[in-house]
Amino acid sequence: MAPAIPESVLKKQATQTKISLQAKQASYEAKQKKRADKKEAIASAEKYTAEYKAAEAAAITNRREAKATGGFYVPAMPKLALIIRIRGTIGVSPKAKKIMQLFRLRQIHNATFVKLNESTIRMLRLIEPYVTYGYPTRSTIEKLIYKRGFGKLNKQRIPIADNSVIQEGVGAVGIKCCADLIHELYTVGPNFKEANNFLWPFKLTSPRGGFSTKTKLVHFLEGGEAGNRGEEINKLVKRMI
């Protein structure tokens, strides 16, 4: 007759079996969630792509109709700006310094998004000598997030390596993947503030070819680098990513 197995050993085996089953179940559920999240992210990307194409087609139609009737097509005013700090703190007034802190531009070559309204436009004009800014395309937003994107989780700077980082940071407001995040920023959606605050300021590099000391002091419209450069900001970002 085989010796009786001590009760303590039986309990230990039962506990180990339970832990093993729980681990397998957790692994299975995690894989299922990952598949579901991936499917949802693909669906979101397809939905937004269709939306972007429809908007572009509508703009083309409006331009053609305006031209056919001898009128002018006036596009909607930009709602989003990308700001890049190009100068240090020497000679910066306390007010300008406070505005740059508000926009989270604490270092040279930091870049952040800002929602354009009367208040932010006034603030941008006050800091024009120290920054350059303009209107980013969807492609530029994508490149910044994919190549230089870091999120803020528990006050820590975390690389956006996959959608799980986005889900943890802003999933509560329905932003669950890169496509959601890009769409919220590009369209300046209802949860723009949460999306923008989740993003750590982008750390760009000195542009290929560099900024000269003289051109940084001159407005873009006068041949320099500072101030509003409109859609030309996209060319600059390509040189700084």
Enumerate the predicted regions with their spans:
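Core subunits and conserved enzymes of cellular information-processing
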Residues: 2-241
